[in-house]
Amino acid sequence: MLKESSKVKKENISKLMVSFSDPFRLEIIDLMMEGEVCVCDIMKLTKLSQSRISYHIKILKEAGLITDRQEGRWVYYSLNKESLFLIKEWITSLTDYSSNRKRCCE
């Protein structure tokens, strides 16, 4: 049985991975790799509607992949480095496991 912290970590990774499953969200993530953005920036650069962007932002926020900060009436979004580190750590563990694993017939 999984330890509780391990189970929570896997649930978090699962949510994060789902957030990568849409090409529009990947496009939004690419924009955030250059720094924080507001919805109006995303609209200009992607030609997506405000409602569609808000939908994708909601999914990215719920997954913990992005954070936001409000400045006056504007909300700026940026990537959550802790979540990116969690994904990187998990993928690294997968590659380490597969490279160190012995084949069944060896």
Locate each region found by the language model:
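Residue-level detector of secondary-structure transition/capping positions
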Residues: 36-37, 61, 92-95
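N-terminal helix-turn-helix DNA-binding core of bacterial DNA-binding proteins
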Residues: 11-51, 71, 75-83
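Juxtamembrane/interface motifs at transmembrane-helix termini
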Residues: 48-51, 63, 75, 97, ...
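Alpha-helical residues within the helix-turn-helix
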Residues: 44, 55, 61-62
